[in-house]
Amino acid sequence: TPANSLSGTGINAQNNQATFAPVLNNLKTTSSVANFLIIPRTPQNCLGNPFPIVISVNPVATISTQKIVTCSGSSFVSSPINVPQNTSYTWKAPSLSTGVYVVSGNQNFNLIGDSTITGNLTYNGVDSGGISTYTITPKSGNCVGNPFNLLVTVRPLPNVSTASQIACSEAAFSSSPTSNLTNISTLYTWDLPVISPANSILGASANNSPASSISQLLIDTTSNVAQATYTVTPIALGCTGKPFTFIAVINPRPNFSNKDTTICPGYPFAMNPSPLPFITSYTWDAPIFNIQNAVIGGQAQPTPLPSFSQVLTNTTNSIDVMATYKVTPRYGDCVGKPFSLIVTVKASPYITDTLTSTVCSGNPFSVKMPKNLPLGSLYYLSLIHISE
């Protein structure tokens, strides 16, 4: 009892046996009882009175090969199932069955007996892991079962050195730093970064879901370089490595409002907007004039220059002309938003004809100026030559 709980030899009815020696196997994980009724018979074929024999058969743990996966340096626990209650285990130090690199910490042994199989192994390889094989002996009560194997796969821990990346403000960066592991994908989680200078960057956040790369879109709110310093945790094959530092260097994008200036014709002018990041450069398109064919000069500049400079000459003699440039600022590879530069080129009094006047000696003289000169023009008189 219970029914179908036992098997073995001598469990069925027998006749004319010289001894009573059944071999019974308990098929359950709890104790079973076999009730036999024995009828003795003498050599003269005389039958004696029947008598009972009751045999309690305790279970023996029968365990197939077990497998478990653990991370290097982490404790593992194995608890076989479908075994008799209060089964304990003993084992000796495991052996390394696969892997080129040594699995250390394998002096774990237990000769007294424990209810679970525990250990802590370290794997220093750079591949997918090594396997240590434990030979475990189960014991249920006083019944010792056959030894079985426990295969412990020890995964390596990813190790990543400090890494950094330079990115432009308002442009997403993505980085997958290389770990010490060979041909094994590494995932990353990270804490909220430390911003330097404080409050200079928008868009930074933590990420608790393992990602294949460190990626964010950060906005530098200043006109200078800013940094976001992340503490990143690498994860490979389900094992968590030591956190490392990742520094995102965010270059600003020059951002200027529209500018205007007024110049005299024929003289070079330069423009350096402020505030601006150092080493800002500029490109610009050819200007658009409000009066066509009224200005000489004004070319496009496709190659970045450290300042904006041109020479414009107003040929109208009397009307101010506006030149509108579309200017694109840059900081390194970071292109800012284009802005307009409106240059007003003043008209210059220009007289091509020789002006004459005849007066009597001792009397003042005046010279009538051309009508097409700029309003408000003033004149300076110098003696050039006296002829007789």
Enumerate the predicted regions with their spans:
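Conserved small/polar residues in nucleotide/adenosyl-binding loops
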Residues: I384-E388
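Solvent-exposed loop segments of extracellular immunoglobulin-like
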Residues: T1-N4, P84-S95, G99, T182-S196, ...
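A short beta-strand segment in extracellular, disulfide-stabilized domains
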Residues: S74-N82, A171-N180, Y267-P275, P364-K371
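Exposed beta-strand face motif in extracellular beta-rich ectodomains
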Residues: S32-F36, G130-Y134, A226-Y230, I319-Y325
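Proline-enriched interdomain boundary motifs that mark the N-terminal boundary
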Residues: V60-Q66, L157-A163, R253-K259, S348-T354
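C-terminal edge beta-strand
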Residues: G48-N58, G145-R155, G241-P252, G336-A347
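Short, solvent-exposed loop/linker segments at the N-terminal edge
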Residues: I68-S74, Q165-A171, T261-Y267, S357-N363
